[in-house]
Amino acid sequence: MSSFDKTMKFNFSDDSAETNVEEVLNTVYDALQEKGYNPINQIVGYLLSGDPAYIPRHRDARNLIRKLERDELIEELVKSYLEQHKEA
């Protein structure tokens, strides 16, 4: 069996204690709204492309979001979504 046939486990360090993902996303969301953008579209654009131009400098949102890895943001979003929509 080749290594391409095996499921790989994805791990990354949990340094999010320094930078709170929820706080960052809320600040970025508010900054985008204040500037008249659709926050969801802009955040998705950033997450897919990695291009910080989707996030304004307003309220230091661009610098804040760049302190976090995109995979960390996606992990937190998926985790939050599943926790809220999980059928128990």
From Swiss-Prot:
<comment type="similarity">
    <text>Belongs to the UPF0297 family.</text>
</comment>
<dbReference type="InterPro" id="IPR009309">
    <property type="entry name" value="IreB"/>
</dbReference>
<protein>
    <recommendedName>
        <fullName>UPF0297 protein RBAM_024500</fullName>
    </recommendedName>
</protein>
<dbReference type="Pfam" id="PF06135">
    <property type="entry name" value="IreB"/>
</dbReference>
